[in-house]
């Protein structure tokens, strides 16, 4: 796939993965629309974006506003990249329903709602349209002390597999990306609990390089072993 000239929506472009991915796509000649959750976090969006938009994945109103705008503005999307996410730590018995719901909403329900609403826009693309979402090694392996996070990411990975089958008729490629632990600082920003001691992870630059390579080369998944 030739990235130059494509218009790509990057959800979570203010985060480490999102910002690096947006910058790499911009350097390759893409038009990038990036989202951030709030005006405060929008300060971390990269320069050079075609548009910077607000998207709170915990707000149905925010999701409807963004998808409604992109569906009616005349913007032709060629790709959607979801790199937003939150993490929490704790045993099953110590994790509250509200904490588990927050992870499910941000990591799965919110992104899937955005992607689903924008599929008709993507389907009009003549540039090999694609959806890419990051789920992680936790969608392949079970780890103790993070059941709510595992559940949210596994749910999203399963949803992506189903979407891949359904989107074929629209000629939309779906890419599930499952890197192992990466040094983005996410674990230190857990919405609940305290992260265990992880071994040294991969660099975010390495993971983003693999992500962009997967888009260009036509892959439909990047397993943890591909990193």
Predicted regions and their residues:
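N-terminal Rossmann NAD(P)H-binding glycine-rich loop of SDR-like oxidoreductase domains
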Residues: 14, 22
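Conserved glycine-rich Rossmann-like NAD(P)H-binding loop of the short-chain dehydrogenase/reductase
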Residues: 28-43
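Rossmann-fold cofactor-recognition segment
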Residues: 47-61
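Conserved NAD(P)H cofactor-binding loop of Rossmann-fold oxidoreductase domains
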Residues: 83-89
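Substrate-binding pocket helix/loop in short-chain dehydrogenase/reductase
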Residues: 91-92, 99-103
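C-terminal helical subdomain
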Residues: 169, 176-177, 192-227
């Amino acid at each position: 796939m030739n990235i130059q000239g494509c218009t790509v929506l990057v959800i979570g472009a203010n985060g480490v993965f999102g910002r690096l991915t947006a910058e790499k796509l911009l350097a390759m000649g893409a038009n990038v629309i990036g989202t951030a959750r709030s005006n405060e976090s929008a300060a971390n969006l990269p320069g050079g974006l075609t548009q910077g938009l607000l998207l709170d994945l915990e707000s149905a109103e925010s999701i409807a506003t963004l998808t409604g705008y992109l569906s009616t503005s005349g913007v032709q999307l060629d790709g959607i990249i979801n790199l937003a996410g939150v993490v929490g730590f704790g045993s099953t018995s110590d994790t509250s329903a509200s904490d588990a719901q927050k992870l499910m909403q941000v990591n799965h329900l919110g992104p899937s709602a955005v992607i689903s609403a924008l599929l008709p826009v993507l389907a009009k693309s003549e540039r090999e349209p694609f959806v890419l979402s990051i789920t992680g090694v936790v969608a392949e392996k079970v780890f103790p002390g993070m059941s709510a996070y595992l559940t949210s990411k596994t749910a999203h990975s399963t949803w992506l597999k189903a979407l891949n089958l359904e989107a074929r008729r629209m000629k939309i490629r779906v890419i599930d990306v499952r890197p192992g632990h990466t040094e983005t600082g996410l674990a230190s920003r857990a919405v609940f609990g305290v992260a265990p001691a992880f071994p040294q992870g991969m660099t975010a630059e390495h993971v983003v390089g693999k992500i962009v390579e997967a888009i260009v080369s036509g892959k439909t998944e990047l397993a943890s072993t591909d990193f």
